[in-house]
Amino acid sequence: LGDYCRYSSSLEPLLSEFAICLIARIWGSGYEWKVHSKIAIDAGVNEDMIESISLGKKPSHMSDEQHAVYEFTMTLNRDRKISDELYNKTYEILGKDRIVDLVGILGYYTLISMTISISISTVPRVTCSPRMALQAIPIHPKKDICTFFPSKADCVI
């Protein structure tokens, strides 16, 4: 499933990585953010958009396709459903195959974010300002697991 989502999806990398960054931000997954924000930029996502996502803000100057991915992703995660109106708007822009692949990508990377949060359950939980999402560092020397490493001024422990 992961290989399909990353390499064979009908969504071009610019859109799939944009969606993955949204999921990483929604879940506060430092590892996913660190890896996929860089891949997204390499795939053509504007750095200002990545910065906006990291701050929990809606990016400006999105293409119609990026806007469709953003609205679909944020609505599905917030409301746990998509209205007929939003589905139809998204369908007009992305089409059925890309909507199906978008839902698969969102589900898969939500699973990854959940798994990572369980994997680091022995690490004290820290709640930080959104800007800190950009500062993920390794926390386990033998595993590729990262967490946020903010300053004390930005955190509640």
Cite the ranges covered by each PLM segment.
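Hydrophobic alpha-helical segments
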Residues: L1-I157
